[in-house]
């Protein structure tokens, strides 16, 4: 992955292992790439980045082995992985004069299924000054969301989590940019409710950024019957639906990276030393 990413035009955020056969012999917490900022930026923009992230791992092989024992994870999280790669390539191919004024940091975390290992490591040992990250946009399972996947599903469906928790400004921006899309998506906020039994706010990589007071937005089309099953296969992905979510995330990243100032944090910051409890009040527009 890291070697092939070099061809999209963005800079790796660390040492590149060119032989994937050796990866399993060493600890790997994340793949990090950077799309350099454009021109004519202010000092505040020059020193800041926006992060677009995803988790790279699925839960892989089921036990005991049977005829089909490989959980390929097409949606969880192949969909998010390729989406972030596509967005990174879109910005990397852009002429520098047209690029956003802040740099964009693209991160593929590993170990999400094991307890958010990769995102915890990256946020504790950030490849850029942590205080320079103005916002984090997280994508995990963005390839389904149809009526056949969940009762409230439809071709415009996407769940948003955390978008108003730390920054009303960021949440409002996501709403505005969605309305500006040729065909707006329909946001479902029910899983963002504090105390929701699915506890989505605490279960994906965005939380390790939020615990340091970085405004986040989590995009997902939600759980479905093939979640963590051997049937999570590519033929069930709604590709155009996924592409529309990708376009919205790219639009949000562009806007955040071009703003004169970072999104205002007006929500309650979590204690980074404590476990996530999902009891804080979410701010709604």
Residue ranges of model-derived segments:
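Metal-dependent peptidase/peptidase-like ectodomains
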Residues: 109-218
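Short, small-residue-biased leader/transition segments that mark boundaries at the very start
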Residues: 1-3
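Alpha-helical metal-binding/catalytic segments enriched in His/Glu/Asp
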Residues: 16-51, 55-116, 249
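Second-shell loop/turn segments in exported
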Residues: 15-20, 66-77, 108, 156-165, ...
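Stable alpha-helical elements in mature extracytoplasmic
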Residues: 77-83, 87, 100, 115-119, ...
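Active-site-adjacent bridging/hinge elements
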Residues: 7-9, 49-63, 220-228
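Short, solvent-exposed loop/turn and secondary-structure capping segments
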Residues: 9-17, 94, 116-120, 148-150, ...
């Amino acid at each position: 992955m890291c070697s092939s990413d070099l061809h999209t035009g963005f800079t790796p955020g660390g040492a590149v292992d060119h032989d994937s056969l050796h990866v399993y012999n060493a600890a790997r917490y994340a793949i990090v790439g950077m799309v350099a900022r454009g021109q004519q930026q202010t000092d505040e923009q020059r020193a800041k980045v926006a992060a677009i992230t995803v988790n790279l791992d699925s839960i892989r092989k089921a036990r005991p082995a049977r005829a089909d024992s490989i959980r390929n994870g097409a949606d969880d999280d192949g969909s998010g992985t390729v989406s972030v790669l596509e967005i990174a390539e879109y910005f990397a191919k852009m002429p520098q004069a047209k690029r956003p004024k802040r740099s964009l940091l693209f991160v593929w975390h590993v170990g999400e299924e094991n307890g958010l290992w990769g995102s915890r490591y990256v946020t504790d040992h950030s490849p850029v000054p942590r205080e320079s990250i103005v916002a984090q946009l997280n994508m995990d399972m963005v390839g389904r969301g149809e009526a056949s996947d969940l009762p409230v599903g439809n071709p415009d469906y996407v769940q948003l989590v955390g978008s108003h928790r730390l920054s009303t400004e960021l949440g409002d921006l996501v709403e505005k940019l969605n309305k500006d899309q040729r065909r707006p998506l329909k946001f479902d906020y029910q899983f963002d409710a504090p105390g929701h039994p699915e506890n989505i706010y605490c279960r994906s990589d965005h939380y390790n950024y939020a615990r340091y007071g970085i405004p986040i937005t989590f995009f997902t089309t939600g759980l479905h019957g093939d979640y963590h099953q051997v049937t999570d296969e590519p033929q069930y992905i709604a590709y155009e639906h996924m592409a529309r979510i990708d376009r919205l995330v790219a639009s949000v990243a562009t806007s955040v990276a071009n703003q004169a100032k970072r999104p205002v944090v007006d929500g309650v910051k979590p204690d980074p030393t404590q476990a996530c409890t999902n009891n804080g009040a979410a701010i709604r527009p």
